[in-house]
Amino acid sequence: EIYLIITAIMWSSGGLLIKLLPDLNGFVINGLRSVVALLVLFIIGGRFPKFNKTIICAGVAHGLCATFFVVANKYTTSANAIVMQNTAPIILLIITAISTRKLPKLAEILILLSAFVGIILIFFDQIGGGNLIGNILGILAGVSFATMFYFNGKKDADAHSSSMLGFFLSFIIGIPFYFSIETFGMSEILPLLGLGIFQLGIPYLFFSIGVKLTTPTTASIIALIEAILNPVWVFVFVGEAPGVFGIIGFFIVIVAVVVKILYDRKSVEKIEISQENI
């Protein structure tokens, strides 16, 4: 579990480091941090990515998620962006229901409605044009994040390969925007290196180790440390904070996600017990 805790803490630095790059376009930030992370995975991971349909789909979802999240941070608060991304378990419920053509259970529907209440409060908190765009991008990051989990959960998936593909796609998406860079000194290079090495590259290596040593439920809950710490770092060092409705919505969504994770664990345990009794 220590690997996952370290991963979540390192992930949580993303919002702060992005805010330290006010003069760079979000697409530029994401593209350049991703190419650094790609090099880290390749050098330390020591292998080329595998390719199949599932890995490509997961990789595309990963690249889109990273892009939406970074650009969202340019338009809304880090708290809003990160909590929208972490609606992934809730959104995954919808994706699963559509793919299996089965309605969610009543308890799942109640969890879903609770999460939507939190999301509405976040939108209501900062409804200005820029913030609205940021919140929408945050939701799209959540959809992409959930899609990535969906494909990485398949038998022929390979999270290491899809991560490398996602980082490469993020770099490609940023190409049209690299020409807009006006200033690029140490004040830009250091945060970008921090994002690529300490916020993306190394944490993904720790995550790949830690996720094998614990249950998916524990991993999911520990990962929420990122959602809580991310806005804390930004508030402490930059002074950015959401409004009252945003804070209330933030905690409603976090609680809904935790309840959903624990509900999934309980459902799996019931299935395992019933199979043992057969």
Where are these regions (language model features)?
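Transmembrane alpha-helical segments that form core, pore/gating elements
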Residues: A8, A37-L41, L92-L93, I127-E182, ...
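Specific transmembrane alpha-helical segments of multi-pass solute transporters/efflux pumps
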Residues: S13, G45-N80, M84-Q85, V117-L121, ...
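Membrane-interface helix-cap regions at the ends of transmembrane helices
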Residues: S13-L16, V36-F51, T67, A115-G130, ...
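Hydrophobic/aromatic residues within transmembrane alpha-helices
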Residues: L21, I29, A72, I98-T100, ...
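Helix-helix packing/entry segments at the starts of transmembrane helices
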Residues: L32, A81-T87, N152-L169, L200-V236
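C-terminal-most transmembrane helix of multi-pass membrane proteins
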Residues: L32-S34, F124, L224-I278
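C-terminal transmembrane-helix exit sites in multi-pass transporters
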Residues: V40-G46, A88-L110, I228-I247
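Hydrophobic transmembrane alpha-helices of multi-pass small-molecule transport proteins
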Residues: L41, H62, I94-I95, P104-F124, ...
